[in-house]
A protein has these predicted regions:
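Alpha-helical transmembrane bundles and membrane-interface segments of multipass inner-membrane proteins
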Residues: 1-204
């Protein structure tokens, strides 16, 4: 199979994930370089996130939508977000301690946010596969789903960069972005459930 440009961007996004995780986790095993490792990991994450928008845009614009892209693009997105959640939680959770939002509160908030995100993504993917296999119907991505993706990207960037670039904010930016991510993750999840439910119900 000859890969087109959107497909190559999707594969490139997957290839970037381990590099992003390695740079973020390196300070846990190394003795220094946390600031630069976090900056580099954030840049890699942002580049990977941009390819998510580019591959879909190019595929639609140039008529290069393929079955490979339909399958791998959302899978690559989930690998990226899941990898980011795991890496942040495993990175010694190096956030600035603060009287505003303590490390413990932020850790617990992000942990539960991560659980909700992973559960939501797996649930929606399962519903999509069941309905598609049963009736061949694909519910297109909603605006809520796109907003959800953006909140996840913003939250990950805040969690990585706020401790080193904006420590005087006392973790407030990261905490607020976690809450916003939780809200839109749940909201979009229920929206997809509502959209898929008639097909699931009729199939049963």
């Amino acid at each position: 199979m000859k890969l087109n440009t959107p497909n190559k961007l999707t594969i490139f996004r997957i290839v970037l994930i381990p590099f992003f995780m390695v740079f973020l986790l390196y300070p846990v095993f190394g003795e220094s370089g946390e600031m630069w490792c976090r900056i580099v990991s954030a840049l890699i994450f942002i580049i990977a996130s941009v390819t998510d928008f580019l591959d879909g845009h190019l595929a639609r614009k140039n008529g290069q939508v393929t079955n490979f892209g339909k399958f791998m693009d959302p899978l690559a997105d989930k690998f990226l977000i899941f990898g980011a959640i795991v890496a942040i939680l495993a990175s010694d959770f190096a956030v600035a301690d603060s009287s505003l939002i303590s490390r413990e509160i932020l850790y617990q908030t992000f942990l539960w946010a991560g659980i909700i995100v992973i559960f939501r993504e797996l649930a929606v993917t399962s519903m999509r596969l069941v309905v598609n296999n049963a009736s061949g119907i694909v519910v297109s991505a909603s605006m809520l789903g796109k907003i959800k993706t953006n909140t996840q990207i913003v939250c990950v960037c805040c969690m990585i960069l706020e401790p080193i670039l904006l420590p005087f904010l006392g973790n407030v930016l990261s905490f607020v972005s976690c809450i916003v991510m939780i809200v839109f993750t749940l909201w979009s999840g229920f929206s997809y459930l509502k959209a898929y439910w008639p097909y699931i119900k009729s199939d049963s």
